[in-house]
Amino acid sequence: MTTIGTPLSPSATKVMLLGSGELGKEVLIALQRLGVETIAVDRYDNAPGQQVAHHARTIAMSDPEQLKALIEAEKPQLVVPEIEAIATPMLESLEAAGVVRVIPTARAARLTMDREGIRRLAAETLGLPTSPYKFCDSLEELQTAIDGGIGYPCVVKPVMSSSGKGQSKIDGPEGVKAAWDYAMAGGRVSHGRVIVEGFIDFDYEITLLTVRALGADGKVETQFCTPIGHVQVSGDYVESWQPHPMHPAALQTAQHIARAVTSDLGGQGLFGVELFVKGEQVWFSEVSPRPHDTGMVTMATQWQNEFELHARAILGLPVSTALKSPGASAVIYGGVDAQGVVFDGVDAALRVPQTEVRLFGKPESFAKRRMGVALAYADDVDTARQRAKEAAACVKPRVAG
């Protein structure tokens, strides 16, 4: 039996989120609806999640001593990493000492904080199909890896980055240095290390949201959401939709891969598993042990969206991955580099049939920063995609004044 206390009282069930962007914000809202006291942590003030949490804290989450001091001061029962750039060895230490439970596990947070840990787990430990790859610490190593078998075209990504930052495709030798420089500019840490992957000529890519939650017998069960299709530009999601049709054999393979990876990572919660698909073939790409940006579409499509699934699973509550309606999401970009922007056209966006708009409340806009998302429902995915893109195009961020 799960017992939940009263927020802001001695009986409170306290959950701390490390990272409070738009995904964390929705997790915080889902937790609060279940009576949880929430603590939103980020590296800058007034992050989206901090605007809705009971408590807002700003620290350098990659600093182990700052992280340790905050957890010991706040005393949450659960710590939920929502980004990669965290001092995960400290989380492992605190979890091992019984100070706090990390979601899904501190080991999972460490392995997924960069592309190297999770790729080696999937390909080398679990033997799952992936693209051919090499890790490189210099421009010279990158060129050697490409010449030594990776070949062209190929994709270069920083070992640690998010939302496609620093990711590019190389079509020939003339693009290698530019790709290396772009990866160095887009990574989250100062030391330069990249993964170079052979390009897979896939038909489409999906996100398979995978939930590890307690069943009626108290044991962890694995459930899958309906596949989510998405379009990425330079590694960053621009639209997604659900359901995405798949050959039954490909779906079975995708679920096998997702189950293998998430079972090894362990714990409870929702995982976003990214996969490439060609016909009946499926390749593992990446996994995030938390809600996924492409999964924002589930706010339109599922009875329990990905954030509610994550909140329920980590609290030991039952979950349902049932689909409610076909739907789609489309990103609203900042368009300008400015603080405190204003948004025109929200009324026009909401006149598009069966649409919703989510503005994230980020204090600073950049031209390619995700500032909101349009959601749409329809009887079929194609109509939903058209509506979501139309609604997103209506919303125009601009400099205030």
UniProtKB/Swiss-Prot annotation:
Pathway: Purine metabolism; IMP biosynthesis via de novo pathway; N(2)-formyl-N(1)-(5-phospho-D-ribosyl)glycinamide from N(1)-(5-phospho-D-ribosyl)glycinamide (formate route): step 1/1. GO terms for biological process: 'de novo' IMP biosynthetic process. The keyword Ion transport does not apply. It holds the Pfam family RS_preATP-grasp-like. One of its GO terms (molecular function) is phosphoribosylglycinamide formyltransferase 2 activity. It comes from the Bacteria. Signal peptide: none annotated. Disulfide bonds: none annotated. Its EC number is 6.3.1.21. Involved in the de novo purine biosynthesis. Catalyzes the transfer of formate to 5-phospho-ribosyl-glycinamide (GAR), producing 5-phospho-ribosyl-N-formylglycinamide (FGAR). Formate is provided by PurU via hydrolysis of 10-formyl-tetrahydrofolate. Homodimer. This is Formate-dependent phosphoribosylglycinamide formyltransferase. It comes from Cupriavidus pinatubonensis (strain JMP 134 / LMG 1197).
